[in-house]
Amino acid sequence: MESFDADTNSTDLHSRPLFQPQDIASMVILGLTCLLGLLGNGLVLWVAGVKMKTTVNTVWFLHLTLADFLCCLSLPFSLAHLILQGHWPYGLFLCKLIPSIIILNMFASVFLLTAISLDRCLIVHKPIWCQNHRNVRTAFAICGCVWVVAFVMCVPVFVYRDLFIMDNRSICRYNFDSSRSYDYWDYVYKLSLPESNSTDNSTAQLTGHMNDRSAPSSVQARDYFWTVTTALQSQPFLTSPEDSFSLDSANQQPHYGGKPPNVLTAAVPSGFPVEDRKSNTLNADAFLSAHTELFPTASSGHLYPYDFQGDYVDQFTYDNHVPTPLMAITITRLVVGFLVPFFIMVICYSLIVFRMRKTNFTKSRNKTFRVAVAVVTVFFICWTPYHLVGVLLLITDPESSLGEAVMSWDHMSIALASANSCFNPFLYALLGKDFRKKARQSIKGILEAAFSEELTHSTNCTQDKASSKRNNMSTDV
């Protein structure tokens, strides 16, 4: 790390760990998810897609596995992005593609689970109708519709993701409108300045550290911070000659979005319009001294003194809002990708349980029901933190202690959501029959047991029992 002239600042920076505990946990989760998910989902795709007979159940779970497999393919990029602390070295296309794949997985998975829940409910309540209308062709058609809708839902991610260059570091983040005033939410970090008592007549170089306020970046598909809520280490920033000034030690915490400039005007966030910056002379004689009281912040303060409020605070307050597209994306994901499917699934499985208590069902039907319930439960456990953090980031002030805490756990919530991609193959193997019996089965036998068609199985069982009775009768005679 680059040391500063101020001993206290240097000590703080050296004592700060490179990664917070939640960052390390996120890396571990992403690494294990990628390894286990690629192996498990790849095996299920091969066996269920090639070795097994195609049934309605195998169609459902095959497409669900495909969505998980695609998500696992994107995880190495997300893991590297987290390790590199927000730097995105893969270019613009992958900046758009990788977050889109994660959101595609979320919507495809939740829509497929909703379809599976409705299918389970129809089998229990309308078995005769299912025997006549439930077929593989219909299942493939529904899965096709699911993929189309999921693709449409992830289009905003692909459209709004953009690549920004800041001091030779590439940042992958949302760009909702680069032509308007920059948004308060886009970039939030603190720049520590060295002590200096001289004014450079040409260019003042301000070297410092980005404050690790939310720890190294989110990985992700998160709406705001696949960005520089990251610890960008030892980044030099330049001020223009006409705006150079002298100061002792100050903490600057600008908020800027759009395309980050390579030259920052001293004491004025680059997000403010150019005409406002030009209309104010910014130098030490005008308003700033070594003992000027600064705006209070979550850490040590803003570079804006109180007598500067009249010029910029009104506009700063105006820009302190969440972009409308970001609000729409987050709310749509919450409602369409979480709440509505959740209520549909709760209703479906409640009806199934109510009916199963009144009627005797085959073990095969109970087994497939358990698999479906387990998959749905794990999905909502994994994705609930993601949506919760997304909503909290919309409504909390990033300068508050709650806002900082939420941002610090953002990447963890996305790692947990991604972890859902590796669980399903193990659920298929562990549920349905006794585990000791499964351990002696082939992979094909395990999946056939998990995805067995209960209607067909029940019919076959009935036919087997009938033939057995006929054989017994002929033997007795």
UniProtKB/Swiss-Prot annotation:
- Glycosylated positions are 9, 168, 197, 201
Recite the UniProt keywords alphabetically.
Cell membrane, Chemotaxis, Disulfide bond, G-protein coupled receptor, Glycoprotein, Membrane, Phosphoprotein, Receptor, Sulfation, Transducer, Transmembrane, Transmembrane helix
> Which parts of the chain span the membrane according to its record?
24-46, 58-80, 97-118, 140-160, 334-353, 371-393, 411-431
Q: Any S-S bridges, and between which cysteines?
A: 95-172
User: Which family does the entry's similarity section mention?
Assistant: Belongs to the G-protein coupled receptor 1 family.
Q: So which stretches are on the Cytoplasmic side?
A: 47-57, 119-139, 354-370, 432-477
Described by its record, this protein's role is as follows:
Receptor for the chemotactic and inflammatory peptide anaphylatoxin C3a. This receptor stimulates chemotaxis, granule enzyme release and superoxide anion production.
A GO CC annotation recorded here is: plasma membrane
Pfam families xref list: 7tm_1
Q: Which residues carry this modification: Sulfotyrosine?
A: 174, 184, 312
Describe its assembly.
Interacts with VGF-derived peptide TLQP-21.
Expressed in which tissues: Detected in varying levels in all tissues examined except the spleen. Especially abundant in heart and lung.
What organism is this sequence from?
Mus musculus
Query: InterPro entries, from UniProt?
Result: Anaphtx_C3AR1, Anphylx_rcpt_C3a/C5a1-2, Formyl_rcpt-rel, GPCR_Rhodpsn, GPCR_Rhodpsn_7TM
Give the bilayer topology.
Multi-pass membrane protein
Q: Per the UniProt entry, what is one GO biological process?
A: positive regulation of vascular endothelial growth factor production
The reply on keyword Cell cycle is: no
Q: What is this protein called?
A: C3a anaphylatoxin chemotactic receptor
Which residues get modified to Phosphothreonine?
Answer: 456
Phosphoserine occurs at which residues?
Answer: 452
> Where located?
Cell membrane
